[in-house]
């Protein structure tokens, strides 16, 4: 009887593989590819917070937060890192607000960046699907989910109610996209805004537009918020920003990366490197003074950052020691994972 069941199972498996290709079904113990490669985020502190040294390939990432908190900056740094490694990047600008000059300052090669400014949400998501399905794009950024307006809403009159249209659009698109994203090992970053629920007395009233589907399909969700202003004298030169890993299916979540987002420069690599070097006792901090290998490098954090910027050899040496202390490489990495599974939502 047992032999009959085994023969029937073998026949069924062969039929499935014949119809749908090799690898369509397999025993979990036989699965060879239990590894996932990652792309650096462009921020050493964020790479550490993500737990795997960057964004995992073939996964969906949601970056959300208040206005002007640095969401697009986080995504542009990821694009710059992909391009540094010789990859291809696409930016779907549904908000029609991308600043090419700012992107260039962050290290993005705007000559090679694929840019689309869709008229409707359906068009934007169809373009994203076509790019992902091609298998020739390494990262696709959609900015933003809130700006992916359904065609019916654009064609309608001001004041018309379209209940759940955007949520259904996102749910349908993600069902289609998630498989091809995983198959082609493309990173999809969805930037999202926040809204407030009306009449909430207890708990967090904040929510993100586009329904619940994106929350479920995302492997990583990042919350970006400004913590404080950075000043040089009386001039405001940037913001201290907290990036919280709210959800992570490839490493422990709820870690926080604190970075300096400087106006016109993006994430300050010197600032985060200095903080992490002090934390690992690679750079000594005594009062307001910072010292490396017994030599003082600056009084006050901004002076120490400037010193590191002007002495690139020392900065590279400190960076190598910090990366070694945290166990993070300098480029694309491959890690072994145990991925948690989640129940996917019904249409909203």
Curated annotation (Swiss-Prot):
**Gene Ontology molecular-function annotations:** ATP binding; ATP hydrolysis activity; ATP-dependent DNA damage sensor activity; damaged DNA binding; single-stranded DNA binding
Main localization, broad class:
cytoplasm
Q: Which UniProt keywords apply?
A: ATP-binding, Cytoplasm, DNA damage, DNA recombination, DNA repair, DNA-binding, Nucleotide-binding, SOS response
Q: Which GO terms describe its biological process?
A: DNA recombination; DNA repair; SOS response
What Pfam families does UniProt report for this protein, alphabetically? RecA (PF00154), RecA_C (PF21096)
Q: Could you tell me which NCBIfam families the record lists for this protein?
A: tigrfam_recA
Q: What is this protein called?
A: Protein RecA
Q: Which gene encodes it?
A: recA
